[in-house]
Amino acid sequence: MDSMANSVSSSSVVNAGNKPAETLNKTVKNYTPKVPYMCVIA
């Protein structure tokens, strides 16, 4: 699970530089079941 969370965090950080809100919305929708990880990343 750690690797999963890390990959999500990395892609979010990289994409955030381009479209923060849009990327965040997509990430939340794609990984909604992993809410705890999203809280840590956010």
Swiss-Prot record:
The keyword ATP-binding is annotated on this UniProt entry: no
Organism listed in the record: Schizosaccharomyces pombe (strain 972 / ATCC 24843) (Fission yeast)
Protein name from the UniProt record: M-factor
Induction per the UniProt record: By nitrogen starvation. It is further induced by a pheromone signal. Its transcription is limited to M cells.
Residues bearing the modification Cysteine methyl ester: C39
Region (Disordered): 1-23
Compartments it resides in: Secreted
One term of GO molecular function: mating pheromone activity
